């Protein structure tokens, strides 16, 4: 059966994401962490394009969904995990190995759960922080340390703890916004333009603030919901 060439187009973006993920791993193993980290960010851009291209060309397929998940494991699971290990994890021996490995495992679980719940969950939110967001948070920490040098012996332990936290958040039931499903309007368009302008001027700092707020938003929202549930239970008791 002949294959429609259009089906290859979105998968080319996915394959490119895997390629960048592998390049990131190679650079990390050579201790070229800045390049390794920015390659993960570049993979995020490609990851956001493949699904949109598939929908625009009407070439969505089960193969594309599974291929995208495998790409995410490489680019947003293995790559940031090894960046973590080569950057600070090796200083902690087996603990560093375990933390790096757990990040990949939790990320794979997150992707598997996403694939089986896509048609049943709220399309405007994710259950658990998405693995691309977790990966970008990891590499942004490394990039910030390369620029501002805040990781020392004690703070390196906190960094590993942060990696564990991201892993737990990926498999948690805490909801995070799904920006792929936002409804565009003039106000949002202006906000995006402002954001892109800030990224152009100060890319690292702007992305770090944005992703930090994204991370905290989910946790604070969850805490408010827990307090509300407890309050309602006490009120009805």
Segment roles from a protein language model:
Residues 1-48, 187, 199, 221, ...:
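Topogenic membrane-insertion module of multi-pass membrane proteins
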Residues 1-18, 53-73, 112-133, 173-186, ...:
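Interhelical loop and helix-boundary elements at the membrane-water interface
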Residues 8-15, 56-111, 141-143:
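Multi-pass membrane catalytic core of lipid/isoprenoid biosynthesis enzymes
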Residues 9-16, 36, 70, 74, ...:
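Alpha-helical transmembrane segments
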Residues 22-25, 42, 46, 80, ...:
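Alpha-helical transmembrane segments of polytopic integral membrane proteins
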Residues 23-38, 74, 78-99, 140-158, ...:
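Helix-coil boundary and interhelical linker segments in multi-pass alpha-helical membrane proteins
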Residues 48-55, 104-116, 155-173:
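Hydrophobic, membrane-facing alpha-helical anchors
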Residues 123-237:
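C-terminal membrane-associated helical module and adjoining short loops/tails
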